[in-house]
Regions:
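N-terminal mature ectodomain segment of secretory-pathway/periplasmic proteins
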Residues: 2-64, 145
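Glycine-rich loops and low-complexity Gly/Arg-rich segments
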Residues: 24-27, 49-51, 77-80, 153-156
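Solvent-exposed helix/loop surface patches that form functional interfaces
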Residues: 46-136
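Intrinsically disordered, low-complexity segments enriched in polar/charged residues with Gly/Pro
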Residues: 1-3, 28-32, 107-108, 124-128
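Gly/Pro-enriched, hydrophobic low-complexity segments
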Residues: 42-47, 127-157
């Protein structure tokens, strides 16, 4: 839900094997019942769940994007992509209750791209927390890397 009570929209992400990695195709809408923005794109992950290629468009306009291989990719309207980072952290030995500093590349519906230093916490089971300056977001990741749910971002007050 948006702050004004409107539904936030919907999203989907399909994956298929691609060489030693995975190819993802994603799409989503922001706003309902009539979307304010539409996001669509494709991403490739290598065998280590690192980003190999990412293409994103909002409302049909391409977003120029150069994504480092080991960032958490947060695309407005496409929350499923954070699951790839959770899988990568688990493969690197992260355990429940542990946290890691991580770079977050955030892509917004206005086509802005920012890089933010954050902290990713594996709370336990499927539950993860992303802590950024002044905000916190929870997400639930299935063992296959699919994001099963996203908790609304909370604004933190200093």
């Amino acid at each position: 839900m948006f702050a004004d009570g409107r539904p936030a929209g919907h999203s989907r992400c399909d994956s298929r094997p691609s060489g030693a990695g995975v190819a993802l195709a994603f799409e989503g809408t922001l706003g309902a019942p009539r979307p304010d923005h539409v996001v669509a794109g494709e991403a490739s992950l290598d065998a280590g769940s690192c980003w190999a290629r990412v293409r994103v468009a909002f409302d049909g306009l391409s977003v120029p994007l150069d994504v480092p291989p080991d960032v958490l990719l947060e695309i407005e309207g496409a929350p499923a992509l954070v699951g790839a980072t959770a899988q990568r952290l688990v493969r690197a030995g992260m355990r429940p209750g542990q946290s890691r500093d991580i770079e977050v590349v955030r892509v917004r519906s206005d086509r802005s791209v920012t890089s933010i230093a954050g902290r990713c916490i594996w709370v336990g089971g499927r539950d993860w927390q992303l802590i950024l300056p002044l905000e916190s977001t929870g997400f639930s990741v299935r063992p296959d890397g699919a994001v099963a749910g996203v908790e609304a971002a909370a604004l933190l007050v200093e």
